[in-house]
């Protein structure tokens, strides 16, 4: 499938970051769906792309990492709040990352009011954001409306380790090409290039990301607990232990 892929560019910057930078400087737009098995480095790649974008816009590396973290969202409403502020001030956001987007942007929820609003915004999103990245274990988790507009499809796979033991990964990038076959317009993905990178973030960046994700996951668990409580009013758990003795479990 990737046999005819072009060789990786020789410069130091990630290919996707370069595309988003070019879009930001020319009032263009880039969107990408990053997928791969859990733990392969999807979020790491997305954050490294965002960091490079901000660094190339003139920010120092540490500040660029901060902005990259602040550009990553777990929930749609948080991103929409920022987008609204930028739109009101006639400014364009360089990049937004929707991490684990399949959780809320899944194809089975396309009819929800929140999703319908997002689809409407996505039609004009290029006026607000230069680059949008979605991460998900599988692109099939995401609603077709968004998938068909994902002009870059990026598959993340592990690729060994560096001498110091740091895991490496490769981002295989496919570009969506519009073709006309027998009078019909079709979209066809063509493998274009690769980005090689290490699956490692600065310690403080990783810790901050983990902390933000923890807050989001705890909120998800609370919401799920509320749903289950509303469906089942009984106070008697089927598993009375509930692994409450954490020390015994993790010894």
UniProtKB/Swiss-Prot annotation:
Region (Disordered): 230-251
Key words, A-Z: ATP-binding, Nucleotide-binding
The protein's role, per its UniProt record: This protein may be involved in virus assembly. Essential for virus function.
InterPro entries according to UniProt: P-loop_NTPase
Residue positions binding ATP: 36-43
The keyword Nucleotide-binding is annotated on this UniProt entry: yes
SUPFAM superfamilies: P-loop containing nucleoside triphosphate hydrolases
Protein name: Uncharacterized protein B-251
MF term (GO), any: ATP binding
